[in-house]
Amino acid sequence: MYFDSKMKKASQIKKILLAFATPARAKVNAWFFKTGKGQYGEGDIFIGVRVPEVRSVVKGVSLEIPLTEVEKLLQDRVHEVRLCALLILVKLFQEAKNKGEKKQVFTFYTKHTKYINNWDLVDTSAHIIVGEYISDYMEHEERLVFINKYIVSKSLWENRIIVLATLYQIKKGNEKMLFYVAERLLHHSHDLMHKAIGWMLREVGKKSGEKTLMEFLDAHIR
């Protein structure tokens, strides 16, 4: 599908996403992401757009898109539209020329976590935006305050954001941030958190070695 490679309007972006909608896939996604009553994704709306299709739309979004337009997408009821907004933020963050531009995206992201409300939305964005920013652009004390705020948050998704944010450090061979977070969230009540922590611990094993991983597990789990 052809579309303008300089898109700056939320309405234009959403229109293209809607053109990719597939009712059958929407039904499957609604089940997969637990949108039923009492489930973690209760009430979320899917239109059946595949992630590669969302990414193809993001490629056509201008780096000059105003955050006010991204906000319209992020506040949308449709899940894939919110995913698109987050992938746009990732694009803006990665293409940012300096700390100031990165901070602008990071601040916007952290002020809108109520809309980052499913595991895929967290997992496609947190390690890039939050992980890099708090690691590379915050002093130790500021970083610790931020991490603790997300650890004690009553929001499942903010809890998951801080776990996934540690992936940035893990990939650099530093597992300390994850171990700090994991120690405090190991007994979280939600299975999605157990899965997130387990995933990050496996990444530690791959990057820092089984010995490092087993020392943590022996001390905290066994």
Where in the sequence are the language-model features?
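Alpha-helical scaffold domains
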Residues: 2-222
